[in-house]
UniProtKB/Swiss-Prot annotation:
<comment type="similarity">
    <text>Belongs to the UPF0102 family.</text>
</comment>
<dbReference type="GO" id="GO:0003676">
    <property type="term" value="F:nucleic acid binding"/>
</dbReference>
<dbReference type="InterPro" id="IPR003509">
    <property type="entry name" value="UPF0102_YraN-like"/>
</dbReference>
<dbReference type="InterPro" id="IPR011856">
    <property type="entry name" value="tRNA_endonuc-like_dom_sf"/>
</dbReference>
<dbReference type="InterPro" id="IPR011335">
    <property type="entry name" value="Restrct_endonuc-II-like"/>
</dbReference>
<protein>
    <recommendedName>
        <fullName>UPF0102 protein Francci3_3586</fullName>
    </recommendedName>
</protein>
<dbReference type="Pfam" id="PF02021">
    <property type="entry name" value="UPF0102"/>
</dbReference>
């Protein structure tokens, strides 16, 4: 596994544990269709939440939040529409969150959960 892939998997694991700890139910993880992949789909109370996970080991490429704008957000919305088409009984209250996982070379891992990010 490439280092980038391993870092991404690590971040998704941390994000999934964080979401479960705050009471969200993981419905899907790494859901794929021909247009791309959704990192996490969770039920948070009455809301169906599509979560994009961004993991960084440093600030060399900017913050993880900067990576989920414009076309990336639009693509996630399209993927969410595809997921909903395959799951017609899912909640109609939809939210898009971003989880930023920071894994510095020293110190603790940090998770920032941005609800309703876009």
């Amino acid at each position: 596994m490439r280092a980038k892939d391993a870092l991404g998997r690590f971040g998704e694991d941390v994000a999934a544990r964080h979401l479960a700890a705050v009471g969200a139910e993981i419905l899907d993880r790494n859901w794929r269709c021909r247009e791309g992949e959704l990192d996490l789909v969770v039920q948070d109370g009455e809301s169906l939440v599509f979560c994009e996970v961004k993991t960084r080991s440093g600030t060399r490429y900017g913050s993880a939040a900067e990576a989920v704008v414009g076309r990336k957000a639009a693509r996630i919305r399209r993927l969410a529409a595809r997921w909903l088409a395959e799951h017609p009984h899912a909640s109609s209250l939809v939210r898009f969150d971003v989880l930023l996982v920071s894994r510095p070379s020293t110190g603790p891992v940090r998770v920032e959960h941005i609800r309703g990010a876009f």
